[in-house]
């Protein structure tokens, strides 16, 4: 799949697995189902100082649009509805309980890798 956040100039492929190596070259599927399916697709990416990958996520606001394309080329629009910061061991944001909705969660490090910035969005 692919993630596009026009407001931030973010446009990257989503790799299927999360490892130290894949996170160095792309954003990755951390947890959940396939792109644009019912459930909560969790995508992780590094927060590099040069704004690469998810380095600009702090600039996103509720109501902003994220686009996710699946492997069949279908693109869905998602509206950001929540952003918050958690400790690295808090994985509650990866819950698959979405009441039948299609959601995406973006995860990146913040505060010098001491915490995680979480961004939640739902299909519109």
Tell where the protein language model's regions lie, with residue ranges:
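Solvent-exposed, non-transmembrane regions of membrane-associated and secreted proteins
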Residues: 1-124
